[in-house]
Amino acid sequence: KLYSLNTFKGSFGYLWKENIRKEHLLNVTDIIYVSPQNVSDLYQRQADTVPALQRVIDKQLIFGPTYTYTYTNTMRKRKKHTFYFKGGIDLAGTITGLAMGADVKAGKEEEILGVPFSQFVRLEADFRHYMRLGEETQLASRIIVGSGFAYGNSQQMPFIKQFFIGGTNSIRAFRARSIGPGSSKPVETNTFLPDQSGDLKLELNIEYRTTLFSIVKGAVFIDAGNIWMLNDPTPEKNFSSKFLNDMAVGTGVGLRFDLSFLVLRTDLGFPLRLPYGDDRWVIDKISFGDGGWRKDNLIFNLAIGYPF
């Protein structure tokens, strides 16, 4: 056991439906407190040399208003084009930081109950389009864009509010939270890999879905994306005008078992393009007959429900 994180969360707000398609969620205040417990010596030694590991076990106090808007017309099954949109804004520590004159860059870091509170603005949008191709076929696509900016009492976004990419519901050809930031290579430690996190996120997915027989449905997909930092000492981690060159790309196939009360999903993905290195496109290296290639590149995902 490396560490434990105790998380306490509370919120007060309003949820209302404008109509069957539109929903608003306004939390007047959303409070999150994260406290690390039982951090092992092994983990602490690694954290002393890898900042990404240290951020995981930092105490975090986050509070402030949040707002989320959701629109969907996907309930119209016979319609050729349907859409889903979810957008949100998180304003943490804004009023408190201004009232207390917090400015960590000027050496004025303010605390509440002995813990520095986070101050940031976070925006995220998730847009999906579903195109009905036939009675049993569909083309589904999604784009996710997210950005977070820390200021005032914070030098960086708190770990739990940063962005992650890769895994079962993301870029399925890469392991969960293993991509980025930017063109940086995965951090190597002697024992484990940290979750890769960033201040910016761009993800694109497209999936062709069809019924094979009875309750079994098939899918072919392509996923792409990455995360970036805004102001990291390591240049390759930061967002730049060359961000498209940092994109990880993967593809694969999957089966979905529609059991009426739930959908059991399996996906098998492999990378087409790495976000780092000199030779990033790896299509010419695909070799299904090579056991070594399969071990290093094939990623199996098991999940409940559709990825989007």
Locations of regions flagged by a protein language model:
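Outer-membrane beta-barrel and related beta-rich outer-membrane complex signature
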Residues: L5-N6, I20-L26, G97-G101, Y151-F163, ...
